[in-house]
């Protein structure tokens, strides 16, 4: 019978199709993750890929689930094929789901609540349910072959003053730890997820000494260099099932050393989820290898 409890750490690398097709259902955080750097990493590895992002800024699961139920023409559908991005406004979720035979479809919480599965912290209470369950049902009914992916974005930069950071007492380590906890709760409640993208770990790893707390462009969204590249590296490694370290693609103007740090931050996140890996020179030396 069908395996009902896939290991979220399962490496799907052996069964990948000739062209990997990835659809993210998300917001600006999925744009950060998949729209800029991911294609180049696959291309450098000689792997054909099509990448889609169903985008509404800041969109939480509740709104995605409502849009799925009403099939609202509410999305900007960004699609990268052959290295070129097209943007189609006023797209329905059903249209995007039917557009390709998607290999992977990711979902994520938005509006700053990705550290809350069914959680109360100080004055904030939030639940991803029943929205997450209902969204998964819609996706599975329309895309039976797709592997479901859960994306767990990163914590804000220390000192960020936006309202969403108040849900975490304006404390980066509180936010990071709550994202780790919420993600584990999601995966326990939903064994349907074949993979999870622990972007919070990759970003937090990269924040250790070499790059520092400079991964965002505004305290919240990833910057266009190290931020987006690091998370792109994580997605690449998780999907390919092989290490991103040594991939020849890096953004224009990025040094080889910086690229190696970003790749290593992502690789260590894949190897050690829900943990921060110190990438300082001393720590790497203690581990008897160069980062």
Regions found by a protein language model. Give the residues of each.
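Bacterial Sec-dependent N-terminal signal peptides
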Residues: 1-16
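Conserved beta-strand elements of the Class I
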Residues: 21-23, 105
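Conserved SGNH/GDSL esterase-like catalytic core that processes O-acyl groups on lipids
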Residues: 32-129
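Alpha-helical cap/lid subdomain in secreted, periplasmic
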Residues: 90-224, 237
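Conserved catalytic region of serine esterases and O-acyltransferases that act on ester linkages
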Residues: 215, 219-222, 226-291
């Amino acid at each position: 019978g069908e395996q009902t409890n896939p290991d979220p750490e399962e490496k799907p690398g052996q069964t990948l199709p000739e062209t990997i097709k990835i659809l993210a259902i998300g917001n600006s955080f999925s744009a950060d993750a998949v729209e800029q750097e991911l294609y180049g990493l696959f291309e450098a590895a000689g792997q054909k890929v099509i990448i889609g992002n169903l985008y509404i800024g800041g969109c939480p699961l509740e709104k995605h689930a409502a849009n799925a139920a009403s099939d609202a023409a509410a999305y900007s559908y960004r699609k990268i094929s052959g290295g070129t991005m097209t943007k189609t406004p006023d797209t329905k979720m059903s249209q995007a789901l039917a557009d390709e035979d998607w290999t992977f479809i990711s979902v994520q919480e938005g509006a700053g609540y990705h550290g809350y599965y069914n959680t109360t912290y100080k004055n904030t209470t939030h639940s991803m349910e029943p929205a997450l369950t209902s969204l998964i049902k819609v996706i599975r009914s329309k895309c039976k072959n797709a592997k479901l992916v859960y994306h767990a974005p990163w914590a804000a930069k220390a000192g960020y003053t936006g309202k969403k950071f108040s849900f975490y007492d304006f404390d980066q380590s509180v936010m990071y730890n709550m994202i780790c906890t919420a993600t584990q709760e999601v995966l326990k409640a939903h064994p349907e997820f074949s993979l999870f993208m622990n972007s919070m770990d990759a970003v937090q790893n990269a924040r250790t000494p070499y790059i520092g707390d400079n991964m965002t462009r505004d305290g919240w969204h990833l910057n266009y260099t190290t931020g987006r590249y690091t998370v792109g590296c994580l997605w690449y490694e998780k999907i390919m099932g092989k290490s991103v370290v040594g991939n020849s693609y890096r953004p224009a103007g990025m040094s080889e050393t910086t690229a190696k740090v970003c790749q290593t931050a992502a690789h260590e996140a894949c190897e050690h989820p829900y943990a921060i890996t110190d990438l300082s020179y001393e720590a790497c030396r203690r581990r008897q290898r160069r980062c």
